Each structure stands twice: as structure tokens, then as C-alpha cells.
Amino acid sequence: MKLKVGKTTLTLSYPLACVTAAVLILDTSGKVLLCFCAALMHEGGHLFALRCCHTPPEEIKLSLFDAAIIDRKKQLHPFSHELAITLSGIAVNFLSASVGWVLYSIHPHPLLKVFIAAHLTLGIFNALPVDSLDGGQALLLILERFFPPDRAERLLLLLSVLILLPTAIIGFWLLLVTKYNFTLLLSALYLTSLLLLKPRKPHRKTSAKRPQIPVS
């Protein structure tokens, strides 16, 4: 499902559209909808930063488990702009959680707790220095300031493995103890699959191009 918004093409997967429709119909509590809103606000932070840098994205792809903002001109961005664009989604989540906390201190509504938890969880998750997450891509930008691109990618890959391996072990232990809590294990396996499936192009010594940076 594609929609043209100015110079940007918005692609929405059918599974995501079906799940969104089901949530709107079945979620009478509003909790799942708040989690969806947190994810949308995260992506909106990236779009706002791109807009501020006067570089609207060429395409936005939204699927059930991922979101990608395609910006083929990102190699022309200054380092500060690219870093701000990468971290803007996390910043929106933490800012929203802070606002929610202030509102909750004034009027302690149960849905505000869900709002705060959704934004904090999404912000902390994306801030992890793992490849394919915003934190990992921001770290890659910084590493490429000091190392060649191929070495920077290897360092990020090593750090990602060092984080995901114990996370998967802890997630498996939680599943055994609780019999139902599989969220952490599923997240670790999902990120590991992205890490394994990510295409890695060989770098030439004479020309060092940054890989495409997906924004989640």
C-alpha cells in the first residue's frame, strides 16, 4: 500500500494495516494504542529532524516489525546533522516520558503510566549500542570519525554480539522462570536475525562509503 506525500513515498505493509485495524477495534483499554502512538512519535522525531535539516526523505517503509526511513542523500549531511537525525527518535521518546511523568504527578491516571512506560521502553531499547538500532547507528557514526569504515563496522558488530548474547541468555532464563515472559528473548532473537541478515559490502581503501542507516 503506497501513498505519495509531497516528494516522499509512504509504503505501508498489509500486515501492519490489518493489525492496526484490529487494535483499534479490539483494544478497549487503549493501552496497545498508546504503544503504537509511542512508536509513531519515535518515527515522527526522525522526520522532524530531517525536516529541520531541509532533507525530506525519499521513502518511508512501515512494516509490522520494522520502520525504515530511506534518505539516499544522508552521505551529504554534516556529521552533526546526521547524528541529530539518528538520535531524534530516542529524544522524542524520553521527552514524551518526561512530560508524561509531570502530568502523572499532577493527575495520576493509569493510562499515563502506560504512556510513560511505552516511551521509556522504546527509548531505552533503541538507545542500545546494537547494530540496526538508533544507538548502534549513532555509535557507528562516531566510530567512523576515528577509524576506517570497515573497522568501525567490526567494532560495532563485536559490541552488538557482546550485548545480544547475554540478553538472549537472560531472556531464556526469564522464560523458564515465568513460563510466559518471552519478550526479552524474542527481542534478542529479532535483533540477532537482523544482524545476521544485514548485507555487508566490502570496503575499498580508496573510497569509504557509509552503509545505509535504517532508522527504527
State what each model feature region is.
Residues 1-216:
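Hydrophobic transmembrane alpha-helices and their immediate loop junctions
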